[in-house]
Amino acid sequence: MAAALIEAGFEVDDVHLSEIGSKIKDLNSYRGLVIPGGFSYGDVLGAGSGMSNTIMFNTKIRKIFSEFLSNEKNFGLGICNGCQFVSGICEIVPGAKSWPSFMRNDSDQYECRLVQLKIESCSSIFFNGMEGSVIPVSYT
C-alpha cells in the first residue's frame, strides 16, 4: 500500500497506534489516514475490531481520532481489514452513522461475489474524475 501511495504522489509514514496514544507522533500533522489490510488479528470477519475497539474504548485516543476525522481537509481510507476498522469507528466519522456493518454470511466462509460499482459524483480524492465509471468489486 505504501508503494502505491508513493507512486501516486503521497508522502508516506508508517505510524503505530501506540505512537499516537503516547504522543510520539501527532495525527494532526497528517492529512490522510490509510488503514490497509494485513491480517491484523487474523484475516477473518471482525479482525479490524481489535484496532477500532482500542480507539473507541480509550478516551484519549478516541478524541485524537475524532478531531482528525472531523477536519474536512483530512481524508481516510480503509482497505480489507482496514475497512472493518473504519466501520468500527463510524460513530466518530462525520456522516457515517448510517453506514452498514459487517455480518457473517450463511456459510461462515469467504465467498467471492463479483459486483459492478458505479462511481457517482463525489468530492473524494480517490474518485476525482471517475464519475460514471463502472468498476468490478469482489466482496463476501
Where are these regions (language model features)?
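Conserved small/polar residues in nucleotide/adenosyl-binding loops
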Residues: 140
